């Protein structure tokens, strides 16, 4: 039996390939992601409002304090998951390709009736939050991958755009053949071709030849034509030569920059404010983002070591520790004394209530035996007789 090794051979996947009908099944997942982002953004908003309320109370700013308290009460009671369908429609289904891919014809109006400024400000900050923007951006990237997978043509186009954007080509104008053998028709064709190419280069390279330079060339050539009687065809050829000499100069060769498809955050990942977007609180939020973060504070042990070197035994944590140990010892001694007092009281009560016991009567046989032993143990009594 011959065994053949299949090392390095990739197994074929038994999963069915993705089809257009599978993409709409992801809609509940997308809405779930949007709902989670809204809940997270509302939590962060409440935390920010709590900090602002504390700062206002410290600075005793009554007007701002009342406004922040109203916003906090609204953020605490309102259910921001009502905006899930609205965000899904406003930021995802606005793309025609995504709408066709998801097979959705949904239209959602703004779901809340906001009458107060505090409500509008809170909703605007949450709908423009970073958490919701990141969730929308992730969903858009997933749908773009589906589009590229289901439409290979789009993948090829995107690859070509990526290659063209990464390269830095330098556009130059082709050489113009101005030989005497060319006919007037060929000259006209070449002239139009070169003019079109120069126009394209001017548009791509940021207008290499300015309008002022064109005017100066035309003026000089028209002046020479009037004085010397030069033909119009030769004038056109001369202008082309001047243009070519200017463009072929190395100092005027400007490399093309990257033509990246830059998408504005407000159009791809952010959220257009359904209410007033020029709110002063939104501007303050943007200013707070640029504040540098402070360094991490020292640990508790490190701070205590510094206090011990600075204050010695008078450090607060040492005093607190000594008082706690003293209170523990006093509590232990008090409980011991209470136990001793209870034990002594119990012994006294037992001795007071105890009745004297009568002597037990022995059995007659034991009584006779006891009496028999008594004389033997008694001391010798009598007179000593001495014999001579």
UniProtKB/Swiss-Prot annotation:
Compartment(s) where it occurs, according to its Swiss-Prot or TrEMBL record: Nucleus, Nucleolus
One cellular component (GO) term of this entry: 90S preribosome
Keyword Coiled coil listed: yes
Coiled-coil ranges from the UniProt annotation: 319-349
Gene Ontology annotations of biological process type: maturation of SSU-rRNA
Region span, Disordered: 174-206, 318-388
Disulfide bridges in this chain: none
One Pfam family named in its UniProt record: BUD22
InterPro entries (alphabetical): Bud22/SRFB1 (IPR037393), Bud22_dom (IPR015158)
Main location per the UniProt record: nucleus
Keywords recorded for this protein, A-Z: Coiled coil, Nucleus
Biased segments, Polar residues type: 179-205
Stated name of the protein: Protein bud22
Provenance organism: Schizosaccharomyces pombe (strain 972 / ATCC 24843) (Fission yeast)
Gene, per the UniProt record: bud22
